[in-house]
Amino acid sequence: MDQIRLTHLRQLEAESIHIIREVAAEFSNPVMLYSIGKDSSVMLHLARKAFYPGTLPFPLLHVDTGWKFREMYEFRDRTAKAYGCELLVHKNPEGVAMGINPFVHGSAKHTDIMKTEGLKQALNKYGFDAAFGGARRDEEKSRAKERIYSFRDRFHRWDPKNQRPELWHNYNGQINKGESIRVFPLSNWTEQDIWQYIWLENIDIVPLYLAAERPVLERDGMLMMIDDNRIDLQPGEVIKKRMVRFRTLGCWPLTGAVESNAQTLPEIIEEMLVSTTSERQGRVIDRDQAGSMELKKRQGYF
C-alpha cells in the first residue's frame, strides 16, 4: 500500500474521529448503533481511538430482529466483553408477540416492524438525542444525498428536502426537545477504504466476510446461506455446499452470499478492485419496493 493511500486513509480517520468527538461534546445522550457488520467494526474502532485511553462515553445499541447469523451474535457478545463496552440490545416485543418473520410476512413488513419500529422504540425508551450509524454514501443512492448530521423529527422521520447545509467541517446540531440527529462518521468512506483500513489497523470482523464452504440454496436469484432450521424448502430446492462469502451482513434469509475464493483481507481488497456491483446487491430489503431505502429512511430507518 503506497504512501498516498495511507495519507488518504488517515485523512478519513481524522475526519471520522472529529465527528465522533463533536457529537460526544455537543449532545447530552448519544448512542452508537451497532449492527455487527464491517462498518460497525470500523466505527467502533474509531470511537475507541477517539477517547483512548478512556472508555466510550456512550453505549452501543443493537436492534435485534432474532434473525441475524449465529456468528454475528457470537461476535457481538465477544466484542462488547473484550472492549468493556456497555451493550444495549432491543427487540420489538410487539413483533415478537406477533411472530413476525421474513419468510411468512415478507422483507418489507419484517424490516418495518423489527428494525424500523424496533429502533424507534429503543431511541424513545432511552431518550437518545443522537445516534451514530455506519452508513456510507457510496452504498446506495438515498444515502448518497444524506448529510453527515441527518436531522430527524420527533417521530424519527427523515425529510430529504429539509436537510441542513454542512460547510466544510461545521455541523448544525441544534434540535428541539423530542427531535434527534442520526450521525454518519463514515459518510465519505468507500467499501474499498473500509477494507484497506481493516487490514491496516488489524480490526477484527465477523468470519462470514471471508470465503468458506457454506450450505446455501438459490432462491429468487439470491444465494441464501442456511443458518438454522427455520426454513421450509420449496419444491426443487436443494441445499449445497459452495464457496461463498458476504459483502454485507443482515438477517440471514434476506442477505445473499456471493461466490468467492477470497479467504484473506488482501484477497478481498484485490477482489474489490475489479468488482462492478454494489455490496448491497444481496440485500433484499433494498429492493422489496420502489425507492425502498428512501421510503424506509423517511419512516425512521437508520
From Swiss-Prot:
It comes from the Bacteria. One of its GO terms (molecular function) is ATP binding. Pathway: Sulfur metabolism; hydrogen sulfide biosynthesis; sulfite from sulfate: step 1/3. Stimulated by an intrinsic GTPase (Probably CysN). One of its GO terms (biological process) is hydrogen sulfide biosynthetic process. Keywords: ATP-binding, Nucleotide-binding, Nucleotidyltransferase, Transferase. It catalyses: sulfate + ATP + H(+) = adenosine 5'-phosphosulfate + diphosphate. Coiled coil: none annotated. The keyword ATP-binding applies. The keyword Transit peptide does not apply. GO terms for cellular component: sulfate adenylyltransferase complex (ATP). Its EC number is 2.7.7.4. With CysN forms the ATP sulfurylase (ATPS) that catalyzes the adenylation of sulfate producing adenosine 5'-phosphosulfate (APS) and diphosphate, the first enzymatic step in sulfur assimilation pathway. APS synthesis involves the formation of a high-energy phosphoric-sulfuric acid anhydride bond driven by GTP hydrolysis by CysN coupled to ATP hydrolysis by CysD. HAMAP family: Sulf_adenylyltr_sub2. Belongs to the PAPS reductase family. CysD subfamily. Heterodimer composed of CysD, the smaller subunit, and CysN. This is Sulfate adenylyltransferase subunit 2. It comes from Escherichia coli (strain K12).
